[in-house]
Regions:
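Phosphate/nucleotide-binding beta-alpha loop and adjacent structural elements of enzyme active sites
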Residues: 1-216
């Protein structure tokens, strides 16, 4: 089943959906079309103006912030799905000014309703950002479609101090086995089956696919 079918299955009229890593709004518009009130997060100054142009007239709220454990602002090479920039023949991501926020604090400060559904596609930063979702796992318990970008442990491409590609649990990243403690299950859309809770929930190296995190 495609990810769009899952969006259609789990989005109910007037539900609240967050599109985290919204790019230029393709998914945000789909979520809106399925009946959700949509809040889109896209920090890249290359993408955000296009996101606003595509989405704000539809009633989608757009925020030019990225998520992290603590708030700060910086210049960093940033993975914005435009990897055509090269230095000395090596493809790199361009340096951009990025504003990081803590999601729980940002929600409170901006009076944003809590989500029923989250689409999370942030090019490996999910391995950090999911650590900040405990208030959601224990609270409103949204369904989360998370795109996982787990690179090999000996690979360092697109891995920047302020925008890491992937952080493994032993290095301080999110331990997906913690989902069991929050009474969440993981569904693999490629097979439409749940991962056995006796198995390791952490992705294998070179994993790049979506998973559904579903409260029991």
């Amino acid at each position: 089943m495609s990810e769009f079918n899952y969006y259609k299955q789990y989005i109910k009229p007037n539900s609240v959906a967050y599109d985290i890593g919204a790019h230029i709004g393709e998914i945000s518009i789909q979520l809106k079309n399925f009946g959700a009130d949509v809040y889109s997060f896209e920090p890249s100054p290359n993408n955000f103006p296009i996101l606003k142009s595509n989405c704000e007239s539809l009633g989608i709220k757009c925020f030019d912030v990225a998520l992290h454990q603590s708030p700060y602002e910086c210049f960093t090479r940033f993975k914005d799905c435009k990897t055509d920039y090269k230095e000395d023949g090596v493809t790199l991501d361009t340096v951009q000014y990025i504003k990081y926020v803590n999601l729980e604090d940002f929600i409170k400060e901006n009076n944003i309703p809590l989500p029923n559904f989250i689409k999370l596609d942030i090019e490996g930063m999910e391995s950090i950002v999911l650590k900040t979702f405990e208030f959601l796992f224990n609270g409103v318990r949204p369904i989360i479609y998370a795109e996982i970008h787990a690179q090999p442990k000996n690979m360092n491409n697109q891995n920047y101090p302020d925008n890491p590609h992937w952080v493994w649990p032993e290095d301080g990243g999110f331990d997906f086995n913690k989902l069991k403690d929050f009474n969440y299950s993981m569904l693999d859309p490629s097979t439409n089956t749940f991962i056995d809770k006796n198995f390791n929930y952490n992705p294998a190296e070179k994993t790049h696919q979506g998973f559904l995190l579903i409260p029991n």
